[in-house]
Amino acid sequence: MKRITDPRSGYYHKNGRGVTAYESFVPQPLQHIVINVEDKGHNGQEPALLALADKALEHLKAKDAEGKEMTEEIAESSVRLEWNVPSMVLLSLGDETEKKKRDIDQQNMVRAIRYGIDCLERLPLSGRLLKDLHWVAMQGEHNEKKYPGEFRTSPIWMGDEHDTLESAPFIPPAPDDMLKAFYDLEQYINADDDVHPLIKAALIHYQFEVIHPFIDGNGRGGQLLTLLFLNERGILKGAAVNLPRVFHLRQFPYFTGLASVEISGTYEKWVRFFLEALMVA
């Protein structure tokens, strides 16, 4: 399959040789991405990104001041979003079996959110912490073969059950490239820079999902990372905003928005979607 990508977002790297060769996407480090904060959308009539980010920041602080605790709601929305990913292949084991799995995943996610927020008081937001949270989130017999708490050491691809490394519409970074990309992301997360924190949160969320460091559970991992980043930056104090619910309600623009960055380099379009989602979370 011929893969089209914009050099602003990254490039495709050829791995292996002969019949086992495949191409995987390598994202540009976020340190290289400069967002046009005056971008006003495709029609030039929408609020500038920086103004929208400031407005979203006010909204989040107001929500946080309400003091609501939404851990269970966030967990439920995160699991629903990941289970509803179009490319996910669900086992045909009947509704009751699937519901039991979702219930286990939801309970695990509640524990992971609470553990993560507690850990921020003594640990930096890092790959080590995310691995620990992934281990908590991926408990249960149905997750045993998904390497809980470990970064993947094999290629994965996004597609349906008929796709292969050759035909899949998207292939995240190969293991070596993934480790380098995650290291760059970790440095970006903890860098002392002048990027607006909510614009930075949008970029971090995108980058984590495109890196896809785990065999499974990356959707929940991305939601955890976003929530913890907002806490680490002092924007939230706990689980006060259910952003995964908005993503779940707007699944199509959420997933196409992530994909469009790779294809066309439209980071600004993704950032706008993310900020607008925060405004209604």
Show where each model-derived region lies:
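FIC/Doc superfamily catalytic core
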Residues: 1-281
